[in-house]
């Protein structure tokens, strides 16, 4: 696709693997587009040259505090310019940034920080109290209010030798088993994936992309921040998605590209129509998942040229691509076709390739080094399970029809909720920590907003003399897990359906669904606190 970034009349050729370094790309863009805005927020903005200066300052500061190659820096921060600068500064030193989910608190937060083994944690003031509640973690904690101001640390930053396959980040994902796994991504993993987003959306210098996702979500980087960096475009960061304010943000910031996940775009679609819906600069979007029945009408109503889709995971982003190029006649619900730099195969449980139309686990091989992630951080058992027979096993069940691929299910019991993967095992473990709960089964039932998404339902069995109602259990879960773990539906039952080997038969619970005895958080006006 001609992967080159112009530096004057000299291209930084990204077809050359050694050029695929995030710090090198920033340096070139700072010279090519010094005055172009790179990151813009509601409070401030920063140009490419200013970002390079800020990254240099933070690199010196980190180096002076003992941060070196392969050290980890946890970031518990709101979306802001400093967040992006700290990641680039860490990578310039060969260090590794670890975004921490800002919804985490209590033991979830403690576990993430302990497992990440950071040398430093940088925290926004909004979250300092959560760290204080955890007690001593034997890690340096720095408030964003204490970051070095302009005029300090102006010496030249160190320039360690970097390699395009070096790990630059660890993204914690719930995985498919309920045990959190740290996905190690390299410079190349990010850049090749961001180039896919650039290619699909036709992004270029002068464009503005809007990021509505939290920065602990890999999609924020691969679809918005890094594509802007690769093209010299501008990325607008907002704190959160707002269905009511989205189109005004698009108009105010001149947004030409964006990404929405889960039910976000369905909320936009279901909002009452108004005159001038199509009067906006948005040209290209990535909306996942977008029902085929809505795609065309959505484009017409809002005046959008193209709605692309991609299928992947933190381990291998943009694995399948579905480009809305006006030429390809995509079958309904097709996930797309494989990216050029990977080989894929659908295998059964014995490792044998399945035939057309038969569900098999999606497995991946890279055609060049460092296309896939670098493995799971300090997790040999997860790596052994994921990499077998020369293939990376994704855990996704797909079927193939000709050259097109279609999603079937997850091999493990995972709940898809508003663009997130919620482990049923993890939710059950939280519920079972309540002294009144003896058994718990969490599962997803089809969402009314989007068929590909779930509403979370939890069925529990209580101690014989326990006095616990559903709302109290919901509050307990809210206090001990991320807010999005709080089920919409809770039902207290006398017993759970079990197999002869005492395994819970969740398919029977799904088939049973919501009953007259089910507590509905939405109907009761219960709202989880973030």
Describe the function of each predicted region.
Residues 481-503, 524-530:
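AMP-binding/adenylate-forming catalytic domain of the ANL superfamily
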Residues 18, 27, 35-80, 84-88, ...:
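Conserved AMP-binding/adenylate-forming core of the ANL superfamily
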Residues 47-49, 168-192:
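Conserved AMP-binding A3 loop
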Residues 191-208, 216-257, 271, 339:
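Conserved AMP-binding/adenylation subdomain of ANL enzymes
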Residues 154-172, 179, 202-208:
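Conserved pre-ATP/AMP-binding loop-to-beta segment of ANL
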Residues 341, 352-385, 422, 517:
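Conserved ATP/PPi-binding loop(s) of AMP-dependent carboxylate-activating enzymes
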Residues 104, 121, 312, 364-369, ...:
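AMP-binding/adenylate-forming catalytic core of the ANL superfamily
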Residues 230, 255-260, 269-329, 343, ...:
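Gly/Ser/Thr-rich phosphate-binding loop
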């Amino acid at each position: 696709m001609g992967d080159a970034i112009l530096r004057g009349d000299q291209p930084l050729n990204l077809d050359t693997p050694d050029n695929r370094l995030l710090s090198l790309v920033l340096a070139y863009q700072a010279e090519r587009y010094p005055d172009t805005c790179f990151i813009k927020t509601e409070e401030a903005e920063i140009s490419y040259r200013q970002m390079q200066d800020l990254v240099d300052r933070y690199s010196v500061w980190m180096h002076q505090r003992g941060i070196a190659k392969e050290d980890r820096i946890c970031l518990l921060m709101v979306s802001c310019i400093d967040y992006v600068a700290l990641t680039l500064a860490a990578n310039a030193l060969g260090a590794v940034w670890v975004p921490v989910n800002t919804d985490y608190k209590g033991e979830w937060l403690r576990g993430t920080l302990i497992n990440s083994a950071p040398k430093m944690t940088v925290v926004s003031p909004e979250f300092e109290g959560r760290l204080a509640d955890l007690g001593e973690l034997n890690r340096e904690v720095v408030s964003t209010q204490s970051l070095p101001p302009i005029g300090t640390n102006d010496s030249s930053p160190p320039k360690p030798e970097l390699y395009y396959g070096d790990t630059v980040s660890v993204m914690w994902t719930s995985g498919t088993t309920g045990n959190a796994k740290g996905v190690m991504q390299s410079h190349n993993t990010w850049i090749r994936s961001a180039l896919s987003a650039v290619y699909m959306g036709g992004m270029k210098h002068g464009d503005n992309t809007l990021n509505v996702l939290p920065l602990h979500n890999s999609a924020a980087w691969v679809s918005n921040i890094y594509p802007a960096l690769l093209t010299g475009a501008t990325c607008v960061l907002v704190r959160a998605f707002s269905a009511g304010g989205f189109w005004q943000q698009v108009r105010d910031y001149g947004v030409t590209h964006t990404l929405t996940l889960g039910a976000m775009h369905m909320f936009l679609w279901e909002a009452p129509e108004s005159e001038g819906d199509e009067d906006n600069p948005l040209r290209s979007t990535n909306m996942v998942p977008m029902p085929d029945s809505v795609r065309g009408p959505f484009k017409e109503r809002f005046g959008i040229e193209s709605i692309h889709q991609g299928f992947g995971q933190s381990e291998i982003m943009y694995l399948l691509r579905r480009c809305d190029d006006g030429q390809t006649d995509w079958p309904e619900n097709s996930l797309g076709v494989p990216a050029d730099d990977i080989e894929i195969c659908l295998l059964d449980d014995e490792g044998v390739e399945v035939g057309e139309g038969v569900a098999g686990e999606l497995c991946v091989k890279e055609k060049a080094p460092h296309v896939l992630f670098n493995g799971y951080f300090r997790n040999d058992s997860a790596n052994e399970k994921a990499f077998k027979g020369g293939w990376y096993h994704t855990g996704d069940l797909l079927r193939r029809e000709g050259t097109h691929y279609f999603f079937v299910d997850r091999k493990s019991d995972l709940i898809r909720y508003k663009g997130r993967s919620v482990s049923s095992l993890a939710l059950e473990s939280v519920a079972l920590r309540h002294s009144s709960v003896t058994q718990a089964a969490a599962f997803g039932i089809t969402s009314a907003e989007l068929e590909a998404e779930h509403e979370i339902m939890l069925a529990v069995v209580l101690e014989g003399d326990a006095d616990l109602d559903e709302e109290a259990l919901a509050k307990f879960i809210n206090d001990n897990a991320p807010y999005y773990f709080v089920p919409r539906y809770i039902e207290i039952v006398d017993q759970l359906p079990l197999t002869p080997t005492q395994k819970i038969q969740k398919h029977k619970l799904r088939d049973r669904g919501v009953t007259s005895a089910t507590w509905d958080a939405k109907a009761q006006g219960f709202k989880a606190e973030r």
